[in-house]
Amino acid sequence: MLLNDARQQIADACSHLSDDGLVVGTAGNLSVREGDLVAITPSGLPYQEMRPDLVAVVEYATGKQVEGPLKPASELDLHLTALRATGQMSVVHTHSLSLIHI
């Protein structure tokens, strides 16, 4: 399996975000870049169901999926653009309930 550590980090982060009530269901995505590959949460899978083997892996340059049984997050282009523009190694995009409460 490609990017084992990155996929495990994403699964762990999804669990923490869900357990801490920071996300609900499938709201948001996480990605981690290692070299010329990016691990990213799959589309439509609730955070509490995330496992490393379900995390999608895509090419950093093209976004083409190279591993994972599920489609990458629908916001893949947003993640790739953010990674390229900032030079950072990861992106966390959530729809946190605490950000919309008044």
Describe these PLM feature segments:
Residues 97:
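Catalytic metal-binding/acid-base residues of hydrolase active sites
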Residues 100-102:
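Conserved small/polar residues in nucleotide/adenosyl-binding loops
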Residues 2-89:
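An anion-binding catalytic pocket shared by soluble metabolic enzymes
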Residues 91-93:
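Short glycine-aspartate micro-motif
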